[in-house]
Design a protein with these regions (language model features):
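Sec-dependent signal peptide recognition
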Residues: 2-8
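N-proximal helix/coil linker or "cap" segments that precede and/or mark the start of modular domains
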Residues: 5, 15-32, 49-50
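Short, acidic, Ser/Thr-enriched surface-loop or helix-capping motifs
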Residues: 24, 37-38, 137-138
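A short beta-strand-turn-helix
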Residues: 33-54
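Short pre-active-site segment immediately N-terminal to redox-active cysteine/selenocysteine motifs
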Residues: 52-54, 58-62, 130
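Structural microenvironment flanking redox-active thiols in thiol-disulfide oxidoreductases
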Residues: 67-108, 118-125
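Thiol/disulfide oxidoreductase modules built on the thioredoxin-like
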Residues: 103-110, 118-163
Length: 168
């Protein structure tokens, strides 16, 4: 009987313990950061936001939904890059798997910037507790959208927002 009671207690409590909601960062100023890109050069967020919207995509090579989402973001990037849209794909791969990032990006032919956040310092600034995690920043450096996870069709919301921001 004690085991059954304990099991029921654990099953009732476990979902609330496991549920980690990302803090709502929409409407806040985007924290600045400086990360290394795949060419070994530093990229600073504040130097990217003045031209138009910036999409931050937190991802990893081992995350299948992340890879699916990045393919969709690449399509959006191709459509709007000449109008000032920037994508910063922030790899959260740890030191042991970061060597897979550059070959993967090259194999897909992605042209947007890929940054390395191996210690998750920037991910923590944006409360990206899980991936994929997407943040859209306007040209004034304000966060206008954030989203955890990926399901086919999520990219349509991002594209709509990017299009609207570029029309202003």
């Amino acid at each position: 009987m004690k085991i059954i009671c304990l099991l029921i207690f654990v099953l009732l409590i476990l979902p609330s313990v496991l549920a980690q909601e990302n803090e709502d960062i929409t409407g806040k100023k985007a924290p600045n950061f400086k990360l290394i890109n795949l060419d070994g050069k530093y990229v600073e967020l504040n130097k990217e936001t003045g031209n138009g919207p910036v999409l931050l995509s937190f991802w990893a090579t081992w995350c299948k939904p992340c890879l699916e989402e990045m393919a969709e973001f690449n399509k959006i990037y191709k459509e709007y890059k000449d109008k000032g849209f920037t994508v910063l794909a922030i790899s959260t791969d740890a030191e042991k798997s970061v060597a897979k990032v550059k070959p993967y990006i090259k194999s897909k032919g992605y042209r947007f910037m890929v940054l390395l956040d191996t210690n998750n310092e920037v991910a923590r600034k944006y409360y990206a507790q899980q991936i994929p995690f997407t943040v859209l920043i306007d040209k004034n450096g304000n966060i206008v959208y954030s989203h955890l996870g990926y399901m086919k069709g999520d990219e349509q919301k991002v594209e709509k927002l990017v299009s609207e921001m570029l029309e202003k």
